[in-house]
């Protein structure tokens, strides 16, 4: 009987429905975390998935402000040469981040209404290279800012959840 129960459970289901707090060790149900803004009872702040954050901020629906095309995220053609991973290209990491997140850059920019006021929100996605801030992110940020200025939105929000400027892109990361 026990084997039948375990066979019916999809593999990895516990990973998708539950989150373990690294601070208090409590296991929380993810839908409950959404309603607490991904903050544990012990006040630990989990990474709030950007799309869920946007869902929680906007009144009903939002439009994504797409990343500009043809921006080189690796203008230095950086190649890592350390003992662990000899000679891999940084662009390979960026391609991996794109595949994992489904995003072109570490930003998700959106427009919609918050409390019946027009708004543009920019969220960093820490799953995209720690929320890197390189040339592609700079251009995406500027596109969202230009959109906000052009539309004269009431609210401009930037949720900065990032590891910082991407050192692999040099001065172009500024």
Model regions and ranges:
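Terminal-region recognition feature
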Residues: 1-174
